[in-house]
Amino acid sequence: MKKIGYLGLGAWGYCLASLLASKGHKVVCWTTKPELAKHLTDTREHPLLAGHLSKGEMTFTTDMSEALKDVDMIVESVTSAGLRSVFEQVRSLGLPNCPIVITSKGIEQDTGMILPEVVIEVLGEEFRSLIGFLSGPSFAQEVIRELPTSVVGTGYTVEVIQEICETFMTPTFRVYPNTDILGVAFGGALKNIIGIACGISDGLALGCSSKAALMTRGLHEIRKLSVACGCKAETLNGLAGMGDLCVTCSSPISRNFRFGTLLAQGLSTEQARNRIGMVVEGAYTCVSALQLSKQHKIIMPISEAVYNIIQGTIKPIEAVSALMKRTIKEEHL
């Protein structure tokens, strides 16, 4: 069994750390919040996952060097905006020669880089062969209850991909190997924008037909931009693309979906963010996606509408009307 250093203790991080511990791995979890580390040590229950006690051997610390000492694998679940600074800390401590698994979803705003590439830029090109990525349709609230879930494990080498699958796989958590790390990362990041759009649709009570159109045309936008950036189209049709899109666009468990619903109900962006109480990755990814779309001359009307609503330059119902009045064109899926 492995000793695993886990960075980040939001709901998703705690959920995956608990899953790994339940398999017999020793998991040392790092957080920047002393009160959270103490609470988890005392209760074994995460505030965002009430009623679900952790299983197996888990310890909690605010000392990153303690979390990374003599580990066989590093896993992270921090925000996309905080990823670079976290791995700058990791680099300063020195690194063991072990796989590093990224589970955060997003695109870095200033660079337009997928998160595995951000980590490689920080740590050095020599670490590329150790980097992996786990993504797909999954909610912490469901995985912690051991409801059947299927995701994708990817990386830059077959060896790391295989190790991710073997390390995370359980009878209720299935991990499919995939060699297209770029496509998996883009699918996991861009679907959050469409999740906000579908939340807006629900908040405006526009019905199922509206949501179906947003999901279908949204996937088209995701696929166009992703392929232009070097991804394989078939990856976006799988769990990391269409699969993740489905759960994000159809469930209030998704914070991106809830964020969109709140915007449709008249809350400002700041008010909606405060109500959610957690990072809404789609709001940040929207900026990066539109920057990339301009570079590649890709038209993304749904993503642009979401961005304008978030910026407060157009009302949600006006954005819907503008989308419906666009010039007639071939569907071109």
UniProtKB/Swiss-Prot annotation:
Pfam families: NAD_Gly3P_dh_C (PF07479), NAD_Gly3P_dh_N (PF01210)
Active site, renumbered: 191 (proton acceptor)
Record key words, sorted: Cytoplasm, Lipid biosynthesis, Lipid metabolism, NAD, NADP, Nucleotide-binding, Oxidoreductase, Phospholipid biosynthesis, Phospholipid metabolism
InterPro entries from the UniProt entry: 6-PGluconate_DH-like_C_sf (IPR008927), 6PGD_dom2 (IPR013328), G3P_DH_NAD-dep (IPR006168), G3P_DH_NAD-dep_C (IPR006109), G3P_DH_NAD-dep_N (IPR011128), NAD(P)-bd_dom_sf (IPR036291)
GO biological process entries: carbohydrate metabolic process; glycerol-3-phosphate biosynthetic process; glycerol-3-phosphate catabolic process; glycerophospholipid metabolic process; phospholipid biosynthetic process
Gene3D superfamilies the record matches: N-(1-d-carboxylethyl)-l-norvaline Dehydrogenase, domain 2, NAD(P)-binding Rossmann-like Domain
Enzyme Commission numbers on file: 1.1.1.94
Function: Catalyzes the reduction of the glycolytic intermediate dihydroxyacetone phosphate (DHAP) to sn-glycerol 3-phosphate (G3P), the key precursor for phospholipid synthesis.
Protein name per Swiss-Prot or TrEMBL: Glycerol-3-phosphate dehydrogenase [NAD(P)+]
Organism lineage: Bacteria, Pseudomonadati, Chlamydiota, Chlamydiia, Parachlamydiales
Gene from which this protein is expressed: gpsA
